[in-house]
């Protein structure tokens, strides 16, 4: 699996983090002050890149978290059938099938180039709505 490590205090809104081994985009991060008996804590709220689920975690600011390496690639659509698209990677010419989200199913047509993201062994078509 491809990831890096970073401390919680280094994170910013808009960056990515692994929560429960799922790549998520940080939408909110708050740091508390150190208390009498403990160090400062960071509360991170993030939304899953591939499943759009909201997740939140609390860690000490010196805690090391995993940062996913997200590869952004392009592929050509070979065919569309039953809410699935067969794609061919533009660089490696590898063919694979990905499910289509209902919002973008009518926009994806055979022959067009589409961007897709790959992280932690999962791929998703990332068309702009």
From Swiss-Prot:
GO terms for molecular function: ribosome binding; RNA binding; translation elongation factor activity; translation initiation factor activity. One of its GO terms (cellular component) is cytoplasm. The keyword Aminoacyl-tRNA synthetase does not apply. The keyword Protein biosynthesis applies. SUPFAM superfamilies: Nucleic acid-binding proteins (SSF50249), Translation proteins SH3-like domain (SSF50104). GO terms for biological process: positive regulation of translational elongation; positive regulation of translational termination. Belongs to the eIF-5A family. This is Translation initiation factor 5A. It comes from Thermoplasma volcanium (strain ATCC 51530 / DSM 4299 / JCM 9571 / NBRC 15438 / GSS1).
